[in-house]
């Protein structure tokens, strides 16, 4: 808790800036595609609850900032609420010539595009930020060549030796030493097969990463898998790779994809009990990390913003009603059936989805409190 309080002058402004930026970009994706699709937009809100300030534009859209800055929404004509729950009863009261401007009255592909645009905007923002960082600062890399093997580690037991070059893990190519850490960290106590190159010959070595608790440079505890190898300048050839604009965009997309796959790996292992759920954090932990990044500099803040943007985009694509992914799931069913899911079924699904999101929020908050006072 002292770490959070010590960084308070950095934490609050940085957290609010990041949250406002990411929410604004996400909702702007919905807004722009909705407008392009001819759907009337009633409100664009950053935050929930009572309005702090705002204005109404010439199209009749109310732009506002609200008291609780933990999200946002775009309210379309014909929506029942901020979650874009369809209001079928109200639709019947709208004049036929106006129904085409409601969200519910728009063509299926326009609704799907409008909903998908929010997460896509988050992914595009992340790619852009990573591209800028790679263009300016480059990317620190090291070859996947072993310099030392920890005693009694999974690697030592499997027969890994200094000088071995890692070629692949479970058939996935390894290009840098960081690729090893990224793949192994989310697979504690899960058997893997590491292919190494030794004196020109490829050798497959089965091993099981050990579950370890480590502390990152910022003081945050984390549980991860490790096989017990390291590298150094002589073996790994530490260097900074620089990229032109187009290469940087490609690297930005690749980095975003790595975050997506790493998150999905973590969630799948969490589901089967291989990873601890206490690493699921909420606003308090994000705020604390925001303050830590701010103390390190603008590059770290931007990198953190990109990571959060990918996470928000991915979270919203989860097939849970009330989230964007839940809406897209309904549209997929509608496309297959040739007609929408019935209002009663949708209403029940939205209630269940809301309960799931609420439980996740409470769980993350509980983890934050335990972390704060632990």
Swiss-Prot record:
Membrane topology, record value: Multi-pass membrane protein
Residue span(s) of domain PDZ: 126-199
Alphabetized GO MF terms: metal ion binding; metalloendopeptidase activity
Signal peptide: none
EC number: 3.4.24.-
Enzyme category, top tier: hydrolase
Positions annotated to bind Zn(2+): 26, 30
Pfam families per UniProt: PDZ_6, Peptidase_M50
Spans through the membrane: 36-55, 112-134, 301-323, 348-367
Active site: 27
Localization (cell): Cell inner membrane
GO biological process: proteolysis
Keywords: Cell inner membrane, Cell membrane, Hydrolase, Membrane, Metal-binding, Metalloprotease, Protease, Transmembrane, Transmembrane helix, Zinc
UniProt cross-references to InterPro entries, sorted A to Z: PDZ, PDZ_6, PDZ_sf, Pept_M50_Zn, Peptidase_M50
PANTHER family found in the cross-reference section: MEMBRANE METALLOPROTEASE ARASP2, CHLOROPLASTIC-RELATED (PTHR42837:SF2), REGULATOR OF SIGMA-E PROTEASE RSEP (PTHR42837)
Stated name of the protein: Putative zinc metalloprotease R01501
Organism: Rhizobium meliloti (strain 1021) (Ensifer meliloti)
């Amino acid at each position: 808790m002292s770490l959070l309080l010590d960084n308070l002058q950095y934490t609050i402004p940085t957290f609010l800036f990041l949250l406002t930026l990411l929410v604004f970009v996400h909702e702007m994706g919905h807004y722009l595609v909705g407008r392009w699709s001819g759907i009337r937009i009633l409100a664009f809100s950053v935050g929930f609850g009572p309005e702090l300030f705002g204005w109404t534009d010439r199209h009749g859209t109310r732009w506002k900032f609200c008291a609780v800055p933990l999200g946002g929404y775009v309210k379309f004509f014909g929506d029942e609420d901020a979650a874009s729950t369809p209001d079928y009863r109200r639709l019947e009261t709208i004049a036929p010539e106006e129904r085409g401007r409601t969200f519910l009255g728009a063509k299926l592909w326009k609704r799907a595009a409008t909903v998908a645009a929010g997460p896509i905007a988050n992914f595009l923002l992340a790619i852009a930020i990573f591209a800028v960082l790679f263009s300016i600062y480059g990317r620190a890399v090291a070859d996947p060549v072993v310099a030392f093997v920890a005693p009694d580690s999974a690697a030592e037991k499997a027969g890994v030796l200094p000088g071995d070059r890692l070629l692949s893990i479970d058939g996935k190519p390894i290009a840098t030493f960081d690729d090893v850490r990224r793949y192994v960290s989310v697979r504690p106590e899960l058997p893997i097969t590491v292919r190494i190159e030794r004196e020109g010959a490829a050798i497959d070595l089965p091993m099981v990463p050990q579950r370890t608790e480590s502390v990152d440079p910022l003081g945050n505890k984390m549980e991860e898998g490790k096989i017990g190898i390291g590298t150094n300048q002589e073996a790994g050839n530490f260097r900074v790779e620089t990229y032109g604009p187009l290469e940087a965009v490609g690297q930005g997309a690749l980095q975003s994809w790595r975050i997506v796959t790493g998150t999905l790996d973590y969630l799948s292992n969490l589901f089967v009990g291989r990873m601890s759920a206490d690493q699921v954090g909420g606003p308090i932990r994000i705020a604390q990390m925001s303050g830590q990044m701010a103390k390190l500099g603008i590059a770290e803040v931007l990198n953190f913003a990109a990571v959060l943007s990918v996470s928000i985009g991915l979270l919203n694509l989860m097939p849970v009603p009330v989230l964007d992914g839940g809406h897209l799931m309904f549209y997929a069913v509608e496309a297959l059936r040739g007609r929408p899911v019935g209002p009663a079924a949708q209403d029940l699904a939205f209630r269940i989805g809301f309960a799931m999101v609420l439980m996740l929020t409470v769980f993350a908050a509980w983890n934050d409190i335990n972390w704060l006072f632990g």
